[in-house]
Structure formats: structure tokens, C-alpha cells
Amino acid sequence: YKTNSELKSMWGESFNTYYEKVKKAVMATKGEVMMYNGKYIDALYFSTSNGRTEDPIYVWNYSAPYLKSVDSKWDIGTKFFNATKTIPISELNQKLGVNINSVNDIQIKSQTTGGRVNSIIIGGKEFTGVNVRMLLGLRSSDFTVAENGSNIVFTTKGWGHGVGMSQYGANEMAKAGYNYSQILKHYYTGITIVKK
């Protein structure tokens, strides 16, 4: 939740335009809720996908029938889709508690259904992609690694945990003509939108 003063600071001169859009969307959907089998859903969301959303089993070790990995091709090419982060090998060793000398000491073992790193071996120690993302401050657990001198370069796709609705994907879907109901039902599999 953001206060009006926080929104004014964030949006600057565009505050009135954006605020009216938000207000219009809220009023148009007033009283509507998303449900799955008669129960309210946990409407998780994140910034930008890598082209697919993620199943929460890989992120938080739980599952929900409406939070399945789905295609989100609309994110490809958006401003937060790709990023790189360069980390000195010495810093990587310290943050992960390993002792590697080169990128050859890093091996991606498996990927998730959403195309992110599931299991990775770094200096003989096994990590999940989510752990590496959190420990190294990466935008996403969909990453590749390369070496540049005494640094490891992580190239990521997407931004966030990847579970639920992609904000940038939803925005691009809206620009392509999808309505809010179609967008929500795409990202939250099998839900109904009910007026309460």
C-alpha cells in the first residue's frame, strides 16, 4: 500500500493522470473477487517474467492449483526482461561460503518448469536457484553465468520470484487488447471472478 504523498513522490507530474486510471480500475471492479473452488485465492504477483511464470513449489515449497507455470511471452523485450550483474569471484566465495577459482567451478544441474535454475553446484556445494538469487541479489533465478577476468557475470531474465501474475506481462496483454478478466484468468489458472 502506498499513501497519496508516496504516490505523488513516485509519479511526480503524472500523479493526477495515473491516480485517475487507478481509481477508474478500482471502481470498475468494485466488489469483484478471484476464487478457486469457492475459496479466495492468494493473488501473488511479481514484476517481469522470463517468458513463463513459475510454480510456487520451486520458490516456497508449496503448491496451489491456480498458481501453475504458464506462458508469459508478453514480457519478452520489456525494460526489465534482461539484466547483468558482475560479481568478483572473491565476493561470490564470501557470500556463498565456497572457494571457486573460475566459472568452471559452477554447474547448473536442473531447471524448473518455468525455465529458472532449480539446482546448481558451486564449488562442490549445492544450492537452489532461489537461494543464489537471494544471496547474490540477482533479479531472477533464471540466470546464466560467464567469466570476465576475476569476475562472474550473471545474466538474468525477468525480475522477481515469478509466481502468479507478471505486472509487465499483464500490462503488455492489456495493450494487445486483452481485458482484465482474460488477463487474470490467464495468470491464475482455473479461477472464477465473482461479484460479492
Where in the sequence are the language-model features?
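Conserved, single-site charged/polar hotspot
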Residues: 1-196
